Amino acid sequence: MINLSTFSSIFIANWKLNGNIEFIKEYFQKLTTNSNNCTVICPPSIYLNHLQTNHKNLFSGAQDVSIYEEGAYTGELSTKMLVDNKIHFCLVGHSERRQYFNEKNETVNLKSNNLIENNIIPVICIGETLEEKEKNLTKDVLQKQVIDCVPNKSYFD
C-alpha cells in the first residue's frame, strides 16, 4: 500500500488513446522526478507493463476498470488484473467515460469501492458538461458527483 502522506504533491498524467512503445522509451529517458512528489502515468492499458520502473515515486495507473471481476466482458480490465500487474492507481468517472459510455455516479462509486477493496487508489474525476456550465449548474453538479462518487470505504482503513 502506498503512503500518500509522504508526498508533497501528486501529479497524474492521462495519456488517453495516445503513445506507443517508442514514445514511452523517449518519455522515460527525459523524465525527471522530484522525490517529494508522486507522479502517476495512466497510459492506454496495453502499455501498462511498459511503465514499470524502479522510481520510488513514479507509478502507473489504469485509465478505467470494470465493475465486474470476471466473465464475458470483452475488453474490460478487472481490479484483480490491475493487482496482478502491480497497478496502484486507477482513474474512474472521467468525463469521456461519462459522455461516450454513459457512465453514471453510481458506477463510479462501485468502481471506487472495488478498487479500495483491492488496495488500489481510485482517482475520482468530476466535472460538468459545457451545457451544465452554461446553465450555471457547476456547483450543484460537482457537489452531487462528490457525494455520489466518493466510496463508502477508505483506502486508509
Report residues per predicted region.
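Active-site loop-to-helix "anion-binding N-cap" substructures in soluble metabolic enzymes
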Residues: 1-157
